[in-house]
């Protein structure tokens, strides 16, 4: 019988399957080096924020389809002093609950992310060729419509690895991934949120 493994990225937002016979076990040294590189990246950002003594007031609501990344995001936001609420919500349920969360938390910045990916190469303009882009698009639409009705200038980042960038922007996202349909770093959405929170109109 064919045995399939489900692979999840540690620092890259990817979830994929592969045959066991195609996999190579990573040695402990390589895993340790990768972990240290990632931790050093976070430490550099944290040091820069402390050095600059930036005060942030933009409130962030972060929806993440992956529980592990949601928990890591909480740690990251706390380390650099961002005012963030992180919720682990499956991609296909985010649109159903977004209005309720916007009412409850009244954020200035909304991050909508999780896992995504193209099913077949080449079909860039077919939203059904993406694992979760249609769910992200619907969540963006719901959030943008709600913000317009309530006169809120909500800044939205949406998407994950290989998401349908153009559809997300058309739906109302200010920032989205990924225009080149590439894999994105776990930190990418968080860094965008951080930069927006530091802008003058958020202070």
Mark where each language-model region is.
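Short, acidic/turn-prone active-site loops that include or flank metal/cofactor-
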Residues: 89-91, 179-189
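Proline-aspartate-enriched helix->loop->beta-strand connector
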Residues: 102-115, 173
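A short, glycine/acidic-enriched catalytic loop
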Residues: 119-136
């Amino acid at each position: 019988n064919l045995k399939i493994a489900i692979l999840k990225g540690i620092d890259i937002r990817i979830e994929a399957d592969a045959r066991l016979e195609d996999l190579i076990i990573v040695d402990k040294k390589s895993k340790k080096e990768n972990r240290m590189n990632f931790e050093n990246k976070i430490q550099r950002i944290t040091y820069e924020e402390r050095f600059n003594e930036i005060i942030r007031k933009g409130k962030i609501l972060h929806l993440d389809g992956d529980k592990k990344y949601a928990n890591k995001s909480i740690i990251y936001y706390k380390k650099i002093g961002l005012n963030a609420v992180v919720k682990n919500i499956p991609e296909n349920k985010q649109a159903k609950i977004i209005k309720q969360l916007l009412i409850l938390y009244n954020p200035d910045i909304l991050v909508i992310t999780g896992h995504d990916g193209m099913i077949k190469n080449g079909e860039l303009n077919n939203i059904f060729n993406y694992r979760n882009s249609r769910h992200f698009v619907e969540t963006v639409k719901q959030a943008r419509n709600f913000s317009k009705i309530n006169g809120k200038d909500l800044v939205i980042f949406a998407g994950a690895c290989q998401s349908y960038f153009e559809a997300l922007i058309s739906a109302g996202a200010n920032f989205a991934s990924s225009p080149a349909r590439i894999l994105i770093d776990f930190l990418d959405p968080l860094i965008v949120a951080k930069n927006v929170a530091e802008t003058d109109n958020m202070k």
